[in-house]
Amino acid sequence: MEIMKKPKIKSIPYEDFIDNESLEKMVKELNEGGANVFVGVLDDLINWGRSNSLWPLTFATSCCGIEFMALGAARYDMARFGFEVARASPRQADMIMVCGTITNKMAPVLKRLYDQMADPKYVIAVGGCAVSGGPFRKSYHVVNGVDKILPVDVYIPGCPPRPEAFYYGMMQLQRKVKIEKFFGGVNRKEKKPEGK
């Protein structure tokens, strides 16, 4: 009976692993050597994982938050889409769902929560109040849309939107995450260099 040899695994020293510079250097070398296929497949794999495990942070101030709670019930089963891990801490969340009216006094709090989230981070504006100010848009104390404070990725209209509309908006965000470039290329927050 032949004993299998233990495979030799090349490891990266911890000092090189702490930051992504060594990984980015390896990707740059692969790109220069003509291995774009490998990087493209790696992009697809990472984006598949990220898109199917988006953890929401809910910032609910009105009736849209109640509709979001219906998503967690057995009838709609949020877990099958990868959104079941709702977080109370912005440091653990991938996206923030702004549900309801945002007042001028609440705007700095929302901005602070967004700033505490790790990159890449996404914003979904849910309901007429978050999208455009809703019926309170002419009031002196209401922000007319979350996009005045944060960069919004997906808008879910409705007053309040049905749970199916929530899912449609979340699936739109999943599609958006799947086509982002993780290695190389231009992401949504970056700009293409001029002249290229």
Curated annotation (Swiss-Prot):
Secretion signal span: none
Essential cofactor(s): [4Fe-4S] cluster
MF annotations from Gene Ontology: 4 iron, 4 sulfur cluster binding; iron ion binding; NADH dehydrogenase (ubiquinone) activity; NADH:ubiquinone reductase (non-electrogenic) activity; quinone binding
SUPFAM superfamilies, alphabetized: HydA/Nqo6-like
Coiled coil: none
Keywords: 4Fe-4S, Cell inner membrane, Cell membrane, Iron, Iron-sulfur, Membrane, Metal-binding, NAD, Quinone, Translocase, Transport
Cofactor note: Binds 1 [4Fe-4S] cluster.
GO cellular component annotations of the record: plasma membrane; respiratory chain complex I
InterPro entries named in the record: NADH_UbQ_OxRdtase-like_20kDa (IPR006137), NADH_UQ_OxRdtase_20Kd_su (IPR006138)
Membrane topology label: Peripheral membrane protein
EC number per UniProt: 7.1.1.-
Binding site for [4Fe-4S] cluster: 63-64, 129, 159
Database matches in Pfam families: Oxidored_q6
Role: NDH-1 shuttles electrons from NADH, via FMN and iron-sulfur (Fe-S) centers, to quinones in the respiratory chain. The immediate electron acceptor for the enzyme in this species is believed to be a menaquinone. Couples the redox reaction to proton translocation (for every two electrons transferred, four hydrogen ions are translocated across the cytoplasmic membrane), and thus conserves the redox energy in a proton gradient.
Subunit structure: NDH-1 is composed of 14 different subunits. Subunits NuoB, C, D, E, F, and G constitute the peripheral sector of the complex.
PANTHER family linked to this entry: NADH DEHYDROGENASE, NADH DEHYDROGENASE [UBIQUINONE] IRON-SULFUR PROTEIN 7, MITOCHONDRIAL
Family: Belongs to the complex I 20 kDa subunit family.
Name of the molecule in the record: NADH-quinone oxidoreductase subunit B
Naturally occurring in which organism (per UniProt): Bacteroides fragilis (strain ATCC 25285 / DSM 2151 / CCUG 4856 / JCM 11019 / LMG 10263 / NCTC 9343 / Onslow / VPI 2553 / EN-2)
